[in-house]
């Protein structure tokens, strides 16, 4: 894939600066990071029972895991849109992390892999992140078929980007039973 102007890769060390600054690696088993694969397409969803239960959705891109904290379990019903708050990039090694982050540390709580697999962008993913709409196909144990991340307009005083994680209407979509 040819790279367009304005879609330059950030060196992994710089991309992980915020991630590393928030952690004490002498006290947590979380990976420090640093390894890089050439254009891998892995994804992982980690159930993170922290201050509030959420699901960390991560896509491998440019040698890091682009990350969002999803407020509820991802749904394969296109009518169920999930709020996904953009978080700092994580190292690729984090895709295999399961364990407990100690109390008093950033993200304290239990982390367990909920789903993992491969992802395929439906358009240039760097452009999609920049424009605020990223469309892709997932091939995981639980999450399959077409999905999209759509950035919401930023509200005053918001410090992080809010996105929606949405299941596309396809043969992998299911309608949730309504009460």
Predicted regions and their residues:
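A charge-rich, low-complexity, intrinsically flexible signal that marks solvent-exposed coils, linkers
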Residues: 1-179
């Amino acid at each position: 894939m040819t790279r367009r102007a304005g879609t330059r890769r950030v060196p992994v060390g710089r991309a992980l600066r915020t991630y590393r600054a928030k952690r004490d690696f002498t006290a947590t088993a979380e990976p420090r990071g640093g390894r890089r694969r050439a254009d891998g397409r892995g994804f992982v969803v980690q159930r993170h029972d922290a201050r509030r239960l959420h699901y960390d959705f991560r896509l491998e891109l440019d040698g890091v895991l682009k990350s969002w904290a999803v407020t509820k379990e991802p749904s394969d019903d296109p009518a169920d849109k999930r709020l996904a708050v953009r978080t700092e990039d994580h190292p690729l090694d984090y895709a295999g992390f399961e364990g407990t982050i100690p109390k008093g540390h950033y993200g304290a709580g239990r982390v367990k892999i909920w789903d993992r697999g491969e992802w395929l962008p439906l358009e240039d993913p760097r452009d999609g992140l920049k424009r605020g709409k990223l469309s892709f196909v997932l091939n995981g144990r639980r999450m399959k078929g077409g999905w999209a991340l759509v950035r919401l307009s930023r509200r005053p005083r918001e410090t992080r980007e809010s996105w929606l994680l949405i299941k596309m209407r396809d043969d992998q979509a299911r309608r949730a039973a309504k009460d």
